[in-house]
Amino acid sequence: MGLPWYRVHTVVLNDPGRLIAVHLMHTALVSGWAGSMALYELAVFDPSDPILDPMWRQGMFVIPFMTRLGITKSWGGWSITGETVNNAGIWSYEGVAAVHIVLSGLLFLAAIWHWVYWDLELFRDERTGKPSLDLPKIFGIHLFLSGVLCFAFGAFHVTGLFGPGIWVSDPYGLTGKVQPVVPAWGAEGFDPFVPGGIASHHIAAGILGILAGLFHLSVRPPQRLYKGLRMGNVETVLSSSIAAVFFAAFVVAGTMWYGSAATPVELFGPTRYQWDQGFFQQEIDRRIRASKSENLSLSEAWSKIPEKLAFYDYIGNNPAKGGLFRAGAMDNGDGIAVGWLGHAVFKDREGHELFVRRMPTFFETFPVVLVDEEGIVRADVPFRRAESKYSVEQVGVTVEFYGGELNGVSFSDPATVKKYARRAQLGEIFEFDRATLKSDGVFRSSPRGWFTFGHATFALLFFFGHIWHGARTLFRDVFAGIDPDLDAQVEFGAFQKLGDPTTKRQIITRLI
């Protein structure tokens, strides 16, 4: 046909059999990618330290999605929570990957079959014998089936009635595990951080989809609406399908970036707003105050802080710190975390407790400034020592560690104090192994950042695709000169004047 590359989909425009074939092949590719990617991630994933080297630090992308749906065990004998497993069963990480690859093969064969046997009687009108598809009825079938699937997921899988439940954790990502979820039918169900809303919304949306599907199967659209929305044109289906996809992509980009019950911190890493708002820092402060009210010493209080919570309060885990074009996992940036050094408390020679101002998200460099509890600047690491008034040396700043590996250790040497002051800008201080992966010290984003960027970008592209194909189908008569009220199926090139009712039945003969 000599079609340019951007027009090749024209070949399936009026060919339902091969339209099915290409969709089957596309689904085969998606399923095959998911299974293959899962096997690759399992080959490189190190499950030995779920606290300081979790899946999101290692750049895992598909493993978190399997985990949030209830998969936690591996045929390799490990569990995502750190326990040893003897019998992982069929629904392990490897089992799910294998099922996707087998499904991909079956879909591949089905695609070939439908490409070869494309002209089925199913696609022909019984009365006329001409190719035709009842698109409103097909829409009703799809709506009904997707409604059944949606309802079943919410009513059975998420609730644990017939399934494992989903990953549920506390707001600070410390106690996560897979468990059944009770549907939340009140106002709390609309809170994006309440897991019960996932169950109730899938149940409600599923029922709505089932009812809407039955409606579209039993009620025909009015003729004016049918023609006005071009319901007989398969490009209308394409346009509305793209709309559904781009809307879903925008929604999940938002729930991933801003956080939700469906995107737990333990599986995808913290959000940037948790650093901006000092979310984990405030919880740590609350716990320290609670411990001090029980007459525990500062050292004992900080020793009770979970290392997992302290690690969240570190800017290197902020997905917005990694540039979009810095490829690789977080571990390839600042390294593999091996231990918490403890909480650094700075004091000047007058006894004021000093706090290092933390680096905002979108700064690569930031002045080291130490303030007291009233926000008054007491010390800094100056850019120009000749004009300094508050340098560590002049003010006599010391640092002491509470909790962690350096618990009880103090330093008064200015060079050491300045080193830890610079590191305290980045939150809690950790020791990193940069040799194993040859980490370059430049922050990377987490899968949360990559997912958001990818889905927001493709949602925008698909939005324009929806506008494009919607305009093509709505204004087809304007673009091609075909009257939208023309009932007869037009065969291109067989008429003296395209779409002219007076010439549509004219027979052109050749005299030999």
Curated annotation (Swiss-Prot):
The compartments listed are: Plastid, Chloroplast thylakoid membrane
One matching Pfam family: PSII
Show the GO MF annotations.
chlorophyll binding; electron transporter, transferring electrons within the cyclic electron transport pathway of photosynthesis activity
Give a GO cellular-component term. chloroplast thylakoid membrane
Alphabetized, the UniProt keywords read: Chlorophyll, Chloroplast, Chromophore, Membrane, Photosynthesis, Photosystem II, Plastid, Thylakoid, Transmembrane, Transmembrane helix
What does the UniProt cofactor note say? Binds multiple chlorophylls. PSII binds additional chlorophylls, carotenoids and specific lipids.
Keyword Protein transport among UniProt keywords: no
Annotated membrane topology: Multi-pass membrane protein
Signal peptide positions (record)? none
- The superkingdom listed in its UniProt entry is Eukaryota
Annotated InterPro entries? PS_antenna-like, PS_II_antenna-like_sf, PSII_PsbB
Q: Which Gene3D superfamilies match?
A: Photosystem II CP47 reaction center protein
Look up keyword Membrane and say if it applies: yes
* Major localisation: plastid
What are the transmembrane regions? Answer: 21-36, 101-115, 140-156, 203-218, 237-252, 457-472
Extract one GO BP annotation from the record. Answer: photosynthetic electron transport in photosystem II
Q: How does it assemble?
A: PSII is composed of 1 copy each of membrane proteins PsbA, PsbB, PsbC, PsbD, PsbE, PsbF, PsbH, PsbI, PsbJ, PsbK, PsbL, PsbM, PsbT, PsbX, PsbY, PsbZ, Psb30/Ycf12, at least 3 peripheral proteins of the oxygen-evolving complex and a large number of cofactors. It forms dimeric complexes.
Give the similarity note: Belongs to the PsbB/PsbC family. PsbB subfamily.
Q: What does this protein do?
A: One of the components of the core complex of photosystem II (PSII). It binds chlorophyll and helps catalyze the primary light-induced photochemical processes of PSII. PSII is a light-driven water:plastoquinone oxidoreductase, using light energy to abstract electrons from H(2)O, generating O(2) and a proton gradient subsequently used for ATP formation.
Q: What is this protein called?
A: Photosystem II CP47 reaction center protein
The organism named in the record is: Physcomitrium patens
What high-level taxonomic lineage is stated for the organism? Eukaryota, Viridiplantae, Streptophyta, Embryophyta, Bryophyta
